[in-house]
Amino acid sequence: MRRASVIALAAAGPLAVALLRLVLPYYSSTGNREAAAAVAANGAAESLVLWLGFIAVLTLAPGLYAIRDRMPAGRLRTTAFTLATIGYLCLPGLLAVDLLLWVGTNQGLPVATVAELADGVHPSAMVAMGLFVPTHILGIVLIGTLALRSRLLPRTVAWMLIISQPLHLASVLSGLPTLDFVAWSSTALGMAWLAATLPPVERMGHDDSAVLAHANGG
């Protein structure tokens, strides 16, 4: 895969989520009734959320895979990418609620009925939500930590990647969509920087592997 393609793939998913979090019409809602009312007032934004979510589903996990084998092997890499992948693969479960909100509103159902549909989402979606939060946050923190320890990124960029997802969590708890956009954009920048910095797998020879192993303390 060409370097430009790897960079684009690594950044596409987090950037799609950054935009999604910025335009989400019910960002500060405290329940599904408020969320349904917000979607009813701005159905176009919710439609955009679903399209951005679709892009994220298609690109988040492949973006991880595109850079995984370019990074130093070891338990830290295995743990980091496993957690991040599990989290990203749970994303469709979160979008299930958005789909219900959009469909119900688009069909002209009352806000109360749409809220009841969202409240009745299948338990698997709730499990996905429960898994998504800790796994993707910890996974990205560990990827940033690996990049910092291995000196694969400038320290400032590595720390930006490390704190990006805890910052996302803080923005959700504080109801600050602009800060959330910054957080996910920081993840996108860190991942793209990694993709631009790391040597292509197919071109890595003995010397390249030795450099990475040495950087990782091997």
Which residues does each PLM region occupy?
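Hydrophobic, aromatic-enriched alpha-helical segments typical of multi-pass transmembrane helices
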Residues: 1-218
